Amino acid sequence: MDNEKVTDTNPKEPSNVESIITTSEVTPSPPPSTTTSTTTNATTTITTSQPQANIIGGKRSRKDDEIISIQEALNDQLEEEKNLLEEAKEQEQEDWGDESICTFDKGYINQSVFACKTCQLSNDKLFGFCYGCSMHCHLYHDVYELFNKRNFRCDCGTKIQEPNNSFKCQLSGILKEDDNNNVNNINNSNNTTTTTTTTTTTTTTTNNNHLNDIDIGSYDKSQILNERNHYNHNFKGKYCYCDSPYDYKEDMIQCIFCEDWFHENCLKLNSNVTDIPSPGEFSDLICADCLSKNQFLLLYPQIRCYIENDHIIIGDNNNNNNNSNNSNSICKVEGGVITPNKKYDLFCKELWKDELCSCLKCKEIYKDKKVEFLFEKDENSLKKKNKTVDENLDNKPVNVFEMGQDVFSKTLPPTQQRALIEGFSDMKEKLKELFSKKLDKNQVITKQDIQSFFVDLNVNKKFKK
């Protein structure tokens, strides 16, 4: 507390004046943008019973030179602990996957993805890996948590890490019995060739999605490239239009198309609205770049949710182009004209995907744009819904503060409870005296002052005995 500053805000009533301190001495420093434990400071997607935008962050922040009272500092600390507890509860509900296996053999799936800053020092190629590899192969590395990525296959130990020949995936080839069927996912039908080190691989056609059945151990993972994986600046630990590292104090919203994360303030600057809807008022965000690449969405004005004169406006469901008939032969937007519009971010209303046309012609557009995922069910949401309330109650993180209160009231005799409360009250009064003295003299409270304070407090405690 060397930098603690005392300011006389009310010289006529020094006894009622609380000491003023700078935030830098009290507010806990934010975690770094990289983590060595993939679940410690991870933040999660908000999930409720209603469709809702993916949002992370949301911590209160103060300016570095802001002057606050001790009460405000304590309130900030309590708020910080509350936020961390809520975050831990949300983390517990996340389906991170099995940390004992690598998901490479499951193919291109929706999963939590991580990137490694440490490995990037020796390899300028972008790559990502699954939760299992983050807990084994990269456990002691600086790891970026990228949250959920769609249709992504684990890169750990593949050819993309070729410059680092000494690195091997520790979980390669480790499968559970019920995962054996997933080996078929090694090569998707969209891949035309596969490089293997053996000549004994048997190729068979099993279904429309996968062409190759590969037995465990019959391929060399280090010679395979995941050509269908998509990489962006998230894999460098950067997010948003501003290309900044993750800051846990700022709210970020995920675009459903590119799966990048955007700061609320940056969205306000980039969008054509002065404010953005709150999380419960819109379902998904489509960033301006993705909207410009998928302009067919402009044919559906009824999916929009935006703010006008401080009121949430939902697009009209009964527009002329909309047809409630979902027949594959009838196009909802036939004859519609896309009018060039100002570049902006699109906030979509609840159940907006149901408004999209499902005729054969439109389905070809979706396939060409590679946005067929819009019609797929969210596997993660289904898993969370299937998780019972009892499981959540049994496994939820413990509120340490509440647990301490419970232990205090149940285990300590009334006499000891009174002694502790009196001791705390005595310390509080003596702190006020110290602050008032420093305030009268307009002096800064130093580390030595605090050390002397506790020495005197212990001496007085002995005399009382």
UniProtKB/Swiss-Prot annotation:
Keywords: Coiled coil, Metal-binding, Transferase, Ubl conjugation pathway, Zinc, Zinc-finger
Pathway named in the protein's UniProt entry: Protein modification; protein ubiquitination
InterPro entries cross-referenced by the UniProt entry: UBR7, UBR7-like_UBR-box, Zinc_finger_PHD-type_CS, Znf_FYVE_PHD, Znf_PHD, Znf_PHD-finger, Znf_RING/FYVE/PHD, Znf_UBR
Gene Ontology MF annotations: ubiquitin protein ligase activity; zinc ion binding
Residue spans, zinc finger UBR-type: 100-174
Keyword Ligase: no
Coiled coil: 65-98
Family: Belongs to the UBR7 family.
Protein name: Putative E3 ubiquitin-protein ligase ubr7
Originating organism: Dictyostelium discoideum
Lineage summary: Eukaryota, Amoebozoa, Evosea, Eumycetozoa, Dictyostelia
Encoding gene, per UniProt annotation: ubr7
